[in-house]
Regions:
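Alpha-helical multi-pass membrane helix bundles of inner-membrane/thylakoid proteins
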Residues: 1-4, 74-75, 87-133
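Alpha-helical transmembrane segments and their lipid-water interface positions
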Residues: 51-63, 85-89, 128-129, 161-172
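A general structural signal for well-ordered alpha-helical segments in protein cores
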Residues: 26-27, 83, 116, 129, ...
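Short, solvent-exposed loop/helix junctions and linker helices
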Residues: 70, 80, 109-113, 145
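Juxtamembrane transmembrane-helix termini in multi-pass membrane transport proteins
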Residues: 2-75, 134-153, 169
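Selective transmembrane alpha-helices of multi-pass membrane proteins
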Residues: 69-100, 157-170
Length: 172
């Protein structure tokens, strides 16, 4: 492995910070947990974890080539992503999301419904897209990554949010 324990720890802390910022996944998870308890929320958390396998892999494989060609552009993109994160946070504080209706698609009963909402919530989550495409290259030198490095990064990318989501669902 070319990635150090220190780099992986910093990335895990970044993932924990990303999880702690409310977004579409939180809305879906809270809606399902409040409407059906932990048994309705855990399939969503698994769906999110599966979806969380896609973005880092896409970022690592796709951005390795892009970074080798357009490295300076990605440096600018990191700052743009940071600014967008700040704007999203301010907007969330100023105008919280509207209340969910009782017949919402987010609260449809069934394990498959919860799982599919989880996958869709993370695949379409702009916060996740910006983090993986804008910030992940700042944690690691993508050209140096080996297959075991990629496997550990993907594992961290799925495990940290899943643990947080399951913990939140248990708490609710």
């Amino acid at each position: 492995m070319t990635v150090s324990f220190h780099e992986l720890l910093l990335y895990a802390l970044g993932m924990a910070g990303l999880w702690a910022v409310p977004g579409p996944v939180w809305v879906a998870l809270i809606a399902r947990a409040l409407s059906g308890g932990f048994s309705a929320a855990w399939p969503l958390a698994i769906g999110v974890a599966i979806g969380d396998l896609v973005w880092p892999l896409t970022a690592i494989l796709g951005l390795s080539w892009i970074e080798s060609t357009y490295g300076d552009f990605l440096s600018i993109l990191r700052w743009v992503a940071a600014a967008i994160f700040l704007v999203m946070g301010v907007m969330l504080i100023r105008k919280p999301a509207a209340a969910l209706s009782a017949d919402s698609r987010l609260t449809r009963p069934g394990m498959w419904a919860g799982f599919s909402v989880g996958v869709a919530a993370v695949i379409g989550n702009p916060k996740a897209i910006l983090f993986y495409m804008g910030a992940l290259p700042g944690f690691f030198t993508l050209e140096r990554l080996t297959a075991p490095d990629v496997a550990v990064i993907i594992l961290i990318s799925a495990a940290i949010p899943m643990a947080g989501n399951l913990g939140l669902a248990l708490f609710l």
